[in-house]
Amino acid sequence: MRDLTEYVCKAMDMLDSIGIKYGNIIDCTVNTRAQKRWGQCRKVPGGYTININAVLLDEQNSEDGLMNTILHELAHSVDGCMNHGANWKAVASRIYSAYGYEIKRTDSAEDKGVIESTRQIEYKYQFRCEKCGKVIGRTRASKFTRNPKWFTHRGCGGHFQKI
C-alpha cells in the first residue's frame, strides 16, 4: 500500500510551486469503508481534514488517480472552494494547466485507473431488468428499492424485479 502522507506532501509542493494557497491541513486519513467516494475534505476547527479511499492507495492502481484525488481535495481547502463552484473550477483549471491533472467533480473507477477487482461494492439490494437482463445494485433503501416496478430501465424501457 502506498504512503498517503508522502503523496499529500508531494501534492502540497505542487500547489505551492504554482502559488495556490490551500488551507491548514490538520489530518489526512485512509478511508477503508467508503464505497462510493474517492475522497473527502472536511472543514474542522483550525483547518481541514482529508480522507482518501484505501482503494486508491493499492499498488495495482494508477498513481495518477491517487494524485488527482488528493489535488481535488486540497483544492476544496482553498478559500471559497468548499463546493464545486466557479472558484473551485478556477483552481482545478490552474492545476490542469500546470500539471495536466484533469480535476473534475466526479470520476469513474476507469478514470481513476482503478482495477475493478480491487473495488468491491457490497450491494444490499439487487434488481434485474425483465427485458434486457441487466443487473443493478443499490446500497440504501429508497423509493426504487421499495417499488422497483414503478421504474423503467433507461436503456431498454423494461421494468425491474428484485433478485
Residue ranges and their predicted role:
Residues 73:
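Walker B catalytic acidic pair
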Residues 1-68, 77-163:
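Active-site-proximal or metal-binding-adjacent scaffold patches in catalytic folds
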